[in-house]
UniProtKB/Swiss-Prot annotation:
Tissue expression notes: Highly expressed in roots and at lower levels in leaves and stems.
Name by which UniProt lists this protein: Zinc finger protein AZF1
Gene3D superfamilies in UniProt: Classic Zinc Finger
InterPro entries documented for this protein: AZF1/2/3-like (IPR044653), Znf_C2H2_sf (IPR036236), Znf_C2H2_type (IPR013087)
ZnF (C2H2-type) intervals: 97-119, 164-186
GO molecular-function terms, A-Z: DNA binding; DNA-binding transcription factor activity; sequence-specific DNA binding; zinc ion binding
Localisation: Nucleus
Region span, Disordered: 1-57, 112-141, 193-231
Gene Ontology CC entries for this record: nucleus
Skewed-composition ranges (Polar residues): 1-15, 123-134
Induction: By abscisic acid (ABA), ethylene, dehydration, salt and cold.
Top-level taxon of origin: Eukaryota
């Protein structure tokens, strides 16, 4: 197809004027290019530029002088102070438990309870007559009276002791054995107001009563029965002559 178009008469007629135009224009272009002058391009010399810039830079002395002038003219700009941070109270400083007596505050209820114990007054600091409790626990058949005495001392220690008192002569002994040995003196003599071999008497002491009142009652009973005995067991017995008929 391409060969046919080239060989056809229409294609040859259109291609001839184009070729002629090109042939006519080529010598003109060549002449114009020949008449023109070449333009010179600017060449940059980096070394020369560096020298010029170095000349423009100030020396060290000038630079220091400029710095001093700038510092003298300028004003110091102070940044505003930062607001203080809110102080956070530590758990140990947070004290809600307060003593009602001295006003001290504590961080825990346990610490407050331990502190309150120091305000408590010790009990039983003095001996009073009302603190002495006398109780009659037991009465022996031989007529002895056993009394338990509890005394509250200042140290809070109760001292309990037993008083063994003879029901006939009202002598007191530290032990029941000593009282029993003493009672034999009364029994061997046979001077018993009741006529029996033994007497059973009991004395009740109430707290707050006086022992002298009980003694007076006992002596009044003895005088009503047969009067006071005319001998003392602590003295040797008198020699008695016995006549037999």
């Amino acid at each position: 197809m391409a060969l046919e178009t080239l060989n056809s008469p229409t294609a040859t007629t259109t291609a001839r004027p184009l070729l002629r135009y090109r042939e006519e224009m080529e010598p003109e272009n060549l002449e114009q290019w020949a008449k023109r002058k070449r333009t010179k391009r600017q060449r940059f010399d980096h070394g020369h530029q560096n020298q010029e810039t170095n000349k423009n830079l100030p020396s060290e002395e000038e630079y220091l002088a400029l710095c001093l002038l700038m510092l003298a003219r300028g004003s110091a700009v102070q940044s505003p102070p930062l607001p203080p941070l809110p102080s956070r109270a530590s758990p140990s400083d947070h004290r809600d438990y307060k003593c009602t007596v001295c006003g001290k505050s504590f961080s825990s209820y346990q610490a407050l309870g331990g502190h309150k114990t120091s305000h408590r007054k010790p009990t039983n600091t003095s001996i009073t007559s009302g603190n002495q409790e006398l109780s009659n626990n037991s009465h022996s058949n031989s007529g002895s009276v056993v009394i338990n005495v509890t005394v509250n001392t200042g140290n809070g220690v109760s001292q309990s002791g037993k008083i063994h008192t003879c029901s006939i002569c009202f002598k007191s002994f530290a032990s029941g054995q000593a009282l029993g040995g003493h009672k034999r003196c009364h029994y061997d003599g046979g001077n018993n107001g009741n006529g029996n071999g033994s007497s059973s008497n009991s004395v009740e002491l109430v707290a707050g009563s006086d022992v002298s009142d009980v003694d007076n009652e006992r002596w009044s009973e003895e005088s009503a029965i047969g009067g006071h005995r005319g001998f003392d067991l602590n003295l040797p017995a008198d020699q008695v002559s016995v006549t037999t008929s």
